[in-house]
Swiss-Prot record:
MF terms in GO: ATP binding; ATP hydrolysis activity; DNA binding
Organism: Rickettsia typhi (strain ATCC VR-144 / Wilmington)
Similarity comment: Belongs to the FtsK/SpoIIIE/SftA family.
Listed SUPFAM superfamilies: P-loop containing nucleoside triphosphate hydrolases, Winged helix' DNA-binding domain
Chief localisation class: membrane
Subcellular location: Cell inner membrane
Protein name: DNA translocase FtsK
PANTHER family found in the cross-reference section: DNA TRANSLOCASE FTSK, SPORULATION PROTEIN RELATED
Domain FtsK: 382-601
Recorded superkingdom: Bacteria
Membrane topology qualifier: Multi-pass membrane protein
Subunit structure: Homohexamer. Forms a ring that surrounds DNA.
Amino acid sequence: MILYYINKILSNNKVQAFILWIIGLAIVIVLISYNIDDPSFNSVTTEYPSNLIGIAGAYLSDFLYQFFGLTAFIIPLACFVWGRNCWHERYRSVFIRIFVVLLALISSSTLLSKIKLEFIPASAGGAVGIIVSNFCERFINQLYLLFQTFVILVVLLEIKLISISNVLIKLSKFLTNLILSFFNYIFPRLSLITIQNNDKLNITSFYQKPASKKVTFTEEASLIPTNPIKCFIKPVCTKISQNKIAALPPISLLCDPKNNHVKGASSSELKQKAEELLTVLNDFGVKGHIININQGPVVTQYEFEPAAGTKTSRVVGLSDDIARSLSALSTRIAVIPGKNVLGIELPNKQREFFCLKELIETPEYQDKSILLPLVLGKDLAGKPLIADLARMPHLLVAGTTGSGKSVGINAMIVSLLYRYTPEECRFIMIDPKMLELSAYDGIPHLLTPVVTEPSKAVIALKWAVKEMENRYRMMSNIGVKNIAGYNEKILEAVKENRVIERPIQTGFDPETGKPIYETVTMNMAKLPYIVVIVDEMADLMLVSGKDIEMLIQRLAQMARAAGIHIIMATQRPSVDVITGVIKANFPSRISFKVTSKIDSRTILGEQGSEQLLGMGDMLFMGNTSKISRVHGPFVNEAEITKITEYLKETSMPVYISEVTEQPEENYSSIDIVDGSIDEVLYKKAVQIVRNERKASISYIQRSLRIGYNKAANLVEKMEKDGIVSPPNHTGKREILLPEM
C-alpha cells in the first residue's frame, strides 16, 4: 500500500519537476563549493570538507571535475530544463534525453580539453575531454566538433533561435529606452523617441500625446492617409468629391473585447479527459497513447498516436461513437500533417467568444507584408489567423444557415475597410438574396451599388473580365508582371516628375503599307485592388449557370496579377453549384458547418465539416491544401452600421455606370485604339459596299483580307452611320447608299 502511494505521488508531473530542480540545485552547490584540498578519490585528509554538501559533496564534485571539468555544469542545466518540461507536460523519451546529455558532455569537454585551470585537477574538459581530444585530432576536424556541440546544446535546451533573438531585441529596446529617457530628462525639449512593442520606431513631438501601443488607425476624420496619388485610371478610377476626403475608420467604432474570458480546464482535468478518451478507444479495439494536448478557445485537440498497424480510416470512423461515449456535441478526427498522430478534437465545456477588434489590434493584422488581410479568427492554440487574399488569390466559402458564414464574410470585408481607402481598394458586391450585403450600399469603396439582380451580376462579371484584360495591356506596355510592379513604376515616375509614354498603331501608310505609330502618354495613376464578393452563388447558377461559370473561371485563372480577387459564398455546396471547373480554380476554401459528409467532401475533399459546432467554427484550407480549424470572431450589425455611416460621411461614392450596364457596341479590344477605328480601312469597306452592293461580314472579310471581328466592327460602324440597315429576320442588310 505504501509503495502504491509513493508511486502515485512520484507519477505526478509537478512532483517530478520539483525533484529534478532540487537535484540540479544540489549539483550546482556541490560544484560551486568545490575545494581541491577536500578529501577525494586522490587525496586523504582528516579535516572536515569545506563543501556545503559535506563529504558526499566533496567526492561528487571531485568526480565530476576530474571526468568532465567545467562541462559538468551541463548536468544541472539539463535537470532544470527537464523539470520545466515536466511542469508543462512536454514529454520525451528518457533514453533520448540521457543520450543527448552524454553527447553534450563529451563534445563540450573535448573543446575545453586544451585549457588548463589551477582549481581543477585535470584540464577544463576533464579526463574525458583529453581522451576524446586526442582521438579527434587524428580523425575529426575541430570546426565540425564546434558545430556539433552547438547543435547538441540547442537540442538539449529545446530552445529556438527565434526566442534568443527576441530576448536580444527586447534587451536592446530596454537599453535604448533607458538611454533616451536619460537624455530626455536632461533635454526636455527634445523629441520623445520610444520603441513600441510592434517593432516600429514612432517619433512624436514633446507637445503631442504618444500614440496607443496597439492601435495605429486614425481616431479623427480630419486625419488624412498619406497617399500621393488621388486619381484613378479610367474607367475604374474616378475623382472623389473634393469637399470630403476618404479616411480609414477609427478603431473605436468596433466593440471593445469583453472581460469574460472563460477559464480553461486544468491540467488534471485534461489528463482525466485523455484517460477517458483512451478507455473509449480501447473499448473499440484501438490501441495507442496520447502524446500531447492542445487546449483552444472552443475545442481541445488530443494528439493520439495509434499502435502500429492501425488504419486511419478505422479511427476516423469512430467519431460519432466517441462523441456519444464522452457525451460530447461532436468529435472531429483528422490527420495532423507532418506528424504520426491523429488529432481528436473535443468541444470545451464553456466556449470563449471574442470580437473583431481584438484581432485587428494584433501585430499579425498590422503586418504590411500581408497585402489584403482577411481576419479569419483564432486557431486551435488561440493564436490569431490572418490570411492574405492576394496570395490565395480567390476564396470559396460554404456553410449552412446559422453556421456563421455571413458573420465571417462581414469580418473579411471590415478587415479590408480598416486597411485600405477607396483610392486603394474597390468592391463589387453581388447579393441576390438582398439581405447580407445591403448594409454596405453607399460606401465609397463600391464601384457600383450592391448588385441584386442576376442579370446585372453577369454584366458586372463581364466588366471585371474586360477590366482585367485592360490592366494586362497596361502592364504589358510598361513591362511589368503584376499590379504591384505597375504601381511601383507609376510612383517612381511621379516622384521624378516624368511621364510614361507608349507607342500605339493608328493606321497604315497608303503608299508603303507600313504601320503608322504615335506616342501616347499614359495616365499616371495607381491601380486599386478590386475585390468581387458574391454572397450566394446558388441563385446565380440557377439563372445563368453557364455564363457565370465561364466568367468565374476566366477571372479565377487570370485575374490575380491584375489585382482582381473573388470571394464567393454559398449555403448549398452541391456539385451543381460548386462545379468541377469552379472547384479547380479555387484552391483556398473555407467550410463552416454543413449538413452532411457529402457536402463536406464537395467543398474540402474530405469529411469533417459536418462535425463542426457552428457559430463561426470553420475549417480553412489554404492554397497548400493543409486544413486547419479556425474559430471566427463576432461582428454585430451595430458595428457594421457605425463603420458604413462613418465612411459615407467622410467620402461620397462615385459609381461607374458601365459595371452594370450592357454596352451598346461590342468592339473587340484588338480593333479599337483609343476609341476609334482605322479610318483608311473603314473608307475602303464603305467603297466596297457602295460598288459591290454587298454588306455581309464575310464578304468584307474576304475583300479586305482581315479578321472576322474587325469586319464585324466595320459593318456595325456602317450601320451606326446610316450606310447599311440593321439585319432583318434572315440576317440580310439593305444598302442605303446610292449606286456610283
